Amino acid sequence: MPRLLSGDDIRRRPEASEMLDSLLATGGLVLLRDSVEWEGRGLLKALIKKSALRGEQVHVLGCEVSEEEFREGLGSDVNSRLVYHDLFRDPLNWSQPGEAAPEGPLKALRSMCRRTDRGSVTIALDSLSWLLCHIPCVTLCQALHALSQRNVDPGDNPLIEQVRVLGLLHEELHGPGPVGAVSSLAHTEVTLSGKMDQTSASILCRRPQQRATYQTWWFSILPDFSLDLHEGLPLHSELHRDPHTTQVDPASHLTFNLHLSKKEREAKDSLTLPFQFSSEKQQALLHPVPGQTTGRIFYEPDAFDDVDQEDPDDDLDI
């Protein structure tokens, strides 16, 4: 788990807000991939806090922890802008079976977002793993795509400027198929790992009509869910090849050799191609005989022709 530091132990650095701003720069799905050793709910709450302090309305679909536990550690200024949709206490809606939403929790959440005020909207899903266990993967992917789009339905609020979805995924609980399907929808992927008591976030950002970028940040989460970047650890940003695409060598399946040796090139140049005219035929075509009305047959034996001395046709003058 990420180590929680007190405010007296560390000195805040301005790059911490830069990391959060880069994750919240655009809309779409931001996928947080955590593990048993490196949990991601702390980073999810840090992003929620950042969005709320920027004046955005934040909707949280809580599935794994209670509302009280989720709000713990967030200030009153953040909790006042947080709308919590509780699926933890009654996930199957047994207490009110007559009011169950047949479309599912994501559809109900989408309808709530239509009534939001002007500005950007952040939707936090805690977690996608719980939803994958209760909703078919195809249905969930379709709902995520619709959820992260702006004004895709006639009933949507036209005042909503941007919809951002923060999805927490416990990667170890799922196979490569569901993880790859959800990952293909994400504009930004954050994979949490680390060494000793230091957490690292490997961030893959995909932007339309731009090359993907890859960053690694080392950080700690404070008790108030602010971030502090560690000093002395390298922060790097570089061009990143999408892991879902494989690099193909264009010369691996050629039927010919691109690079010839000197001896091979001389042998190639000495060959006579089958469609080349012999010198006799070239002269006949370039200098036709006047008055000739009959056709002529030109034959120039190849080096591998089998000449039969007893064949009477070989005596013909053609």
UniProtKB/Swiss-Prot annotation:
Q: Which keywords does the record carry?
A: Cytoplasm, Nucleus, Phosphoprotein, tRNA processing
Q: Which gene encodes it?
A: Elp5
The record's CDD domains line, in alphabetical order, gives: Elp5
Q: How does it assemble?
A: Component of the elongator complex which consists of ELP1, ELP2, ELP3, ELP4, ELP5 and ELP6; in the complex, is required for optimal binding of ELP3 to ELP4.
Q: InterPro entries, from UniProt?
A: Elp5
Major localization class: nucleus
Please name the pathway: tRNA modification; 5-methoxycarbonylmethyl-2-thiouridine-tRNA biosynthesis
- Protein name as annotated: Elongator complex protein 5
Disulfide-bonded cysteines: none
